[in-house]
A protein has these predicted regions:
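Structural signature of the histidine kinase catalytic ATP-binding subdomain
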Residues: 10, 31-34, 70
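STAS-typified acidic loop motif
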Residues: 5-17
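Heptad-repeat coiled-coil signal-transmission/dimerization helices
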Residues: 15, 19-22, 113
Length: 155
């Protein structure tokens, strides 16, 4: 299994480092461009939510740790932050059937992540949020293997 990790300051300016890290990992593992793009979308949504809603303005000097793992057909993403407790698996996403004007703002990023992964686990350990995601390469995102759909409602 190939593995790599990075620790970032919880600041928007660090996103370029995260992009370069993920892009390099994807190329090293030989992921096709569409899968590399999906990985970048997942990390963009998680990072932006953590920095914007979970850490700032509550915690100055927060950190975000990202670990990636690859074994043929399976991409693992671990995202850890020291922000406010937040379980995205328990978060009720937006009602996409509702008219745009009626729908509240927010929640689409979590919905996007849910649609791109096959397995997810969350836990709060100490003062940190731990989110573990698995994306199976070669299996369409919306086809959840029996018994593996997280929380009955996606990520």
């Amino acid at each position: 299994m190939k593995r790599a990790s990075i620790t970032l300051r919880a600041e928007h300016a660090e996103f370029t480092r995260l992009q370069a890290f993920a892009d390099g990992f994807a190329h090293q593992c030989g992921l096709p461009d569409d899968e590399r793009s999906r990985l970048l979308i997942i990390l963009d949504e998680l990072f932006t939510n953590a920095v914007t809603h979970g850490l700032w303005p509550y915690s100055a000097g927060g950190t975000i740790a990202v670990a990636l793992g690859w074994r043929t057909g399976r991409l693992r993403i671990t995202f850890v932050d020291d922000g406010q407790p937040f379980d995205p698996l328990a978060f009720r996403g937006p009602d996409l059937e509702e008219a745009t004007e009626e729908r509240g703002i927010g929640g689409l990023g979590i919905h996007i992540v849910r649609s791109l992964v096959h397995q997810a686990r969350y836990r709060r350990e100490g003062d940190r949020n731990h989110l573990h995601l698995v994306r199976r390469i070669g299996l369409p995102s919306r086809e959840w293997p029996s018994g593996e759909r997280p929380g009955g409602a996606g990520v």
